[in-house]
């Protein structure tokens, strides 16, 4: 599975934020050996990015405590 570049180009949000979300999701998929990886030939980052950009997986920014 190749991530559709057009979807990335048209993204209007914070690209750093969604990249961090996709990275975290890739870690989660790899850690639990999610069955979706078998369907996609083991492409963890592509699977995670597709899930985050398509809205299959929601993410939120947690407030950081200072001090």
From Swiss-Prot:
Quote the InterPro entries the UniProt record gives.
Pol_omega/Rpo6/RPB6, RPB6/omega-like_sf
Tell me which UniProt keywords the record has, alphabetically: DNA-directed RNA polymerase, Nucleotidyltransferase, Transcription, Transferase
For molecular function, the Gene Ontology terms on record are:
DNA binding; DNA-directed RNA polymerase activity
- Please give the start and end residues of each transmembrane region: none
- Pfam family for this entry, one: RNA_pol_Rpb6
Provide one Gene Ontology biological process annotation: DNA-templated transcription
Into which EC class is this enzyme placed? transferase
Q: Does the keyword Nucleotidyltransferase apply?
A: yes
Q: Which GO terms describe its cellular component?
A: DNA-directed RNA polymerase complex
**Catalyzed chemical reaction(s):** RNA(n) + a ribonucleoside 5'-triphosphate = RNA(n+1) + diphosphate
Q: What is its EC number?
A: 2.7.7.6
Tell me if Transcription is a UniProt keyword of this record.
yes
Q: What does this protein do?
A: Promotes RNA polymerase assembly. Latches the N- and C-terminal regions of the beta' subunit thereby facilitating its interaction with the beta and alpha subunits.
Family per UniProt? Belongs to the RNA polymerase subunit omega family.
Quaternary structure and partners: The RNAP catalytic core consists of 2 alpha, 1 beta, 1 beta' and 1 omega subunit. When a sigma factor is associated with the core the holoenzyme is formed, which can initiate transcription.
Q: What is this protein called?
A: DNA-directed RNA polymerase subunit omega
């Amino acid at each position: 599975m190749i991530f559709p570049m057009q979807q990335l180009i048209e993204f209007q949000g914070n690209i750093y934020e969604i990249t961090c979300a996709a990275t975290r999701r890739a870690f989660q998929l790899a850690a639990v050996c999610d069955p979706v990886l078998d369907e996609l030939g083991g492409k963890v980052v592509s699977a995670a990015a597709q899930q985050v950009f398509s809205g299959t997986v929601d993410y939120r920014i947690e407030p950081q405590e200072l001090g």
